[in-house]
């Protein structure tokens, strides 16, 4: 069954709702320039509330040093999503089995080879303005090709309850990742959309 990652969680209520509805991964953003940025205090609150629930906690970082990433793992995050221009050496230092490496897709197939031992790769839509949360899709042929090559892929970028089923059928990813596609406003999830997104993904 295809896994669901709900990203851009900023508050306790959203985190618990997503986990109880069947999300497999909850993503919390530590990048201060993101409109979905979550402070350390709030992060710790979310992690504590999710203890004992069958959901993996993912910290999303953009070009942060190893020391900060280690702090996040010590806080209780299961996985680190490297969403910037991080190199493989940082990935190895963190432990590739704990890393989801993001590739922001333009027109060509990204070179993912050296990250093949990572927990997974996540394909998102390239934008000059933002690291993720763009609400725009990219050419799914690229994602499909990487899946066919045997990579463990999270499909992201512009997914919502209306198109997620089509994306899954075409790409056949390991998982799907959504943020803005299930929001009522930046940083606040729309519970109806979350429920519908998970339902349509899990019906595959």
UniProtKB/Swiss-Prot annotation:
E.C. number(s) listed in UniProt: 5.3.1.24
Keywords: Amino-acid biosynthesis, Aromatic amino acid biosynthesis, Isomerase, Tryptophan biosynthesis
Pathway: Amino-acid biosynthesis; L-tryptophan biosynthesis; L-tryptophan from chorismate: step 3/5
Domain of life: Bacteria
UniProt cross-references to InterPro entries, sorted A to Z: Aldolase_TIM, PRAI_dom, RibuloseP-bd_barrel, TrpF_fam
Gene Ontology terms, MF aspect: phosphoribosylanthranilate isomerase activity
Catalytic activity, reaction form: N-(5-phospho-beta-D-ribosyl)anthranilate = 1-(2-carboxyphenylamino)-1-deoxy-D-ribulose 5-phosphate
CDD domains reported in the protein's UniProt record: PRAI
GO BP of this protein: L-tryptophan biosynthetic process
Database matches in HAMAP family: PRAI
Family: Belongs to the TrpF family.
Protein known as: N-(5'-phosphoribosyl)anthranilate isomerase
Species, as recorded: Aquifex aeolicus (strain VF5)
Gene designation: trpF
